[in-house]
């Protein structure tokens, strides 16, 4: 117990010391709110019965961060993200209602996403800060298209990813949520981040099926 208390005290002391550092033009000692923009890419996939491998997409976002306490370099960040999601080489669930044998489906859809992440600032040097983060995200798909091609031919057909009448098993649910974790690095207001998003809600509409959307992501941007 004594060692645990000492470790906790050391952690709080180190947190207080981090509060004085500055990363480039961003000073934790002076600024409690920051704004930023992000641009990057995702490698998204669908798991479960959807079973679709990685599909590369684009991300655009505007973010805002708040430091709730002057004593610790902890930030709460949110924003609005536009992200391309989906997967390719999907199983029979993600195709059309009448899926030919040997067909390949490429699922694509675009989402608006609102994350709510907690970041902790770690000083690397006077110019560089590292910020691990985690938190939930909430998303809603605004559009989507699924393209199905029969292997060995040029024959293909497209359908709306969320089309209950034409998409296999009623298509996908538009709303979803999950967990987001990763690490960011800031240098002179330039910000880089890498991470992974785990879908925790079932996006398959039919009750007897399950599926989740997951994605690796890499973004670059600036914090102002």
Segments from the language model and where they lie:
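Membrane-embedded beta-strands of outer-membrane beta-barrel proteins
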Residues: 37, 60-62, 80, 114-118, ...
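Outer-membrane beta-barrel transmembrane domain signature
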Residues: 68-74, 104-191, 195-203, 224
């Amino acid at each position: 117990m004594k060692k645990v208390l000492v470790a906790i005290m050391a952690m709080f002391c180190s947190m207080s010391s981090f509060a004085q550092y500055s990363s480039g033009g961003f000073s934790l000692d002076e600024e409690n709110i920051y704004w930023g923009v992000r641009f990057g890419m995702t490698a998204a996939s669908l798991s479960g019965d959807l079973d679709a491998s990685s599909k590369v997409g684009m991300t655009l976002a505007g973010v805002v961060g708040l430091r709730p306490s002057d004593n610790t370099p902890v930030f709460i960040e949110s924003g609005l993200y536009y992200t391309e999601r989906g997967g390719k080489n999907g199983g029979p669930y993600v195709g059309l209602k009448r899926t030919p044998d040997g067909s390949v489906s490429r699922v694509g859809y675009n989402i608006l996403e609102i994350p709510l992440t907690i970041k902790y600032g770690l000083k690397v040097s006077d110019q560089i800060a590292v910020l691990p983060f985690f938190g939930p995200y909430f998303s809603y798909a605004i559009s989507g298209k699924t393209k199905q091609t029969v292997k060995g031919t040029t024959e293909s057909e497209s359908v709306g990813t969320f089309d209950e009448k034409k998409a296999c098993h009623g298509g996908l649910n538009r709303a979803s949520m999950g967990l987001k974790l990763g690490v960011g690095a800031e240098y002179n207001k330039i910000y880089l981040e890498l991470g992974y998003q785990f879908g925790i809600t079932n996006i398959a509409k039919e009750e007897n099926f399950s599926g989740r959307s997951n994605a690796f992501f890499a973004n670059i941007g600036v914090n102002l």
